Amino acid sequence: MKAYQQYIRNVDPYVPGEQPHFDQMVKLNTNENPYPPSPNVLQAIAAIPLQEQRLYPDPTAHQLNAAIAKRYGLQEDQVFSGVGSDDVLAMLFLTFFNGTKPILFPDISYAFYPVWAKLFGIPYEAIPLDEQLRIVPEDYYRPNNGIVFPNPNAPTGIALPLDAIRSILEHNPDSIVLVDEAYVDFGAESAVSLLPEFENLIVVQTFSKSRALAGSRIGFCMGAPELIRALNNVKYSFNSYTLNRTAIAAGTAAMEDEDYFQRHLKLVVETREWTKQQLAQLGFQFPDSKSNFLFVTHPDYDMCQLFTYLRSKQIFVRQQKWKPYWLPFGNFCKQNTRLDSKEKI
């Protein structure tokens, strides 16, 4: 067997969420926003001169990074952007997690973490959640070469309070701590406010969920200028031109439209709380999600059978290796369709 073949055999790739194409379906499997992005996004894209498409985009994504920095009260040299938060996280793993000690992350969490660790040859420990599916900060008070966790966690939707994140940072002053905030806008408290206190903290966010730009693939992280410089050095060693002109314009417009952002966040959160009430009345059990999805189980239903049944009704949820399965939700109309289907089981 050739060396590269053995290497590829050891790679266990991440399985992306299915993107089905049916006219009448309820798509709940990848946590997309049920609402369109800000109307300013379309205007910004339309304003790009066609002749500029022959030119490479700005490798620094200055326009976008400046908008992000302004929104979060930071300097531009504290912001790094990439092709979705997956691209940003992969670059962070490659840049900072290169020691002999293991990195730490929850065992029930974002499935890409162990994929990157194995791909880049990074030793890791998957730390179990407690019986209530919560991250326990004290479990991360051990020797490590870095820590990464989502807040809120995925797929549980449970959020760590800011004091718990502070505790993890205080007990790991020599380790980079990545807080993956893909879903933070739906009800958790962002760790961005801790950046002035901790130079080992990096906060990762995305435009895919709360800003409804999953199709544009825009992610970013925020941290100390020294860390962002190191990250850019690695980026420029791979691909200088990551974000295209359209994505930069779209992301900038979305970031600057705060009113639209807040109004539609409120709608998603209201729908989530309504869905919790409806599912509880049907006997479902779930943690208190602060994301835009729920992680549910039911004492009378087999989740594998429920997954198959919902799929037969063109209701697409994400099948996980963990049980119970989590069920993200769309808009109010889609919720009625989904709950009616469960009532017929």
Feature locations, PLM:
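Conserved PLP-anchoring active-site segment centered on the Schiff-base-forming lysine
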Residues: 95-116
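Phosphate-binding glycine-rich loop
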Residues: 62-102
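Short beta->alpha connector loops at strand-helix junctions that form conserved
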Residues: 107, 126-130, 205, 320-321
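N-terminal "arm"/small-domain region of PLP-dependent enzymes with the aminotransferase-like
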Residues: 1-55, 143
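Conserved PLP-binding catalytic core of the aspartate aminotransferase-like
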Residues: 269, 281-313
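Active-site phosphate-binding strand-loop segment of PLP-dependent enzymes
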Residues: 125, 129-185
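PLP-dependent enzyme catalytic core of the Aspartate aminotransferase-like
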Residues: 163, 312, 316-345
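PLP-dependent aminotransferase class I/II
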Residues: 200-279, 284-287
